[in-house]
Regions:
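Hydrolase active-site cap/lid region
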Residues: 3-48, 105
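Active-site nucleophile elbow and catalytic-triad environment of alpha/beta-hydrolase enzymes
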Residues: 49-65
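Short beta-strand/loop motif that positions the catalytic acidic residue
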Residues: 69, 74-77, 81
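Short alpha-helix in the alpha/beta-hydrolase fold that links the catalytic acid
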Residues: 71, 85-94, 103
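Acidic catalytic loop of the alpha/beta-hydrolase fold
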Residues: 79-84, 112
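Histidine-bearing beta->alpha loop at or near hydrolase active sites
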Residues: 103-114, 119-125
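Short, hydrophobic alpha-helical segments
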Residues: 126-134
Length: 134
């Protein structure tokens, strides 16, 4: 969602829950769960590759594209998410270029990031921003 919103100007509104692939190098320090641990597994076997890994992953990191997002966007994160650490969600949110952005934080929620509570917010958001689309 994030990268597509950044790269496609025709995207008129976006919503991303528990954003993944953000702040790779921070995420590997913040969580010990997979899939991010695959990076640590590789770096333990190839410690000399850390700089190359960081450089390569920057090409795929959503944060690298976030400043190009111009459409309205909402992000929801779970503050106890051990898959996509909330810190990386905060970094993503602060990097988003759109002036119309809102972050929803769900305390007591993990990777589901308040999904069941948040569904109606997403529905209302799209209804507002995609009026007249069929």
């Amino acid at each position: 969602t994030v990268t597509t919103s950044a790269m496609r100007s025709e995207v008129r509104a976006a919503a991303a829950g528990a954003p993944y692939l953000c702040g790779y190098m921070d995420a590997i320090e913040l969580t010990d769960t997979y899939p991010y641990q695959e990076i640590n597994d590789y770096l333990r076997a190839n410690p000399e590759s850390r700089e190359d890994v960081a450089n390569t992953l920057s090409y795929f990191d959503c944060i690298s594209f976030a400043d190009k997002i111009k459409c309205p966007i909402i992000i929801n994160i779970g503050l106890q998410d051990n898959v996509c650490p909330p810190e990386t969600g905060y970094s993503l949110f602060s990097s988003i270029g759109s002036k119309q952005k809102k972050l929803f934080e769900y305390d007591g929620h993990g990777h589901e990031a308040g999904r069941y509570i948040h569904t109606s917010i997403v529905d209302d958001f799209f209804a507002e921003h995609l009026k007249g689309d069929s």
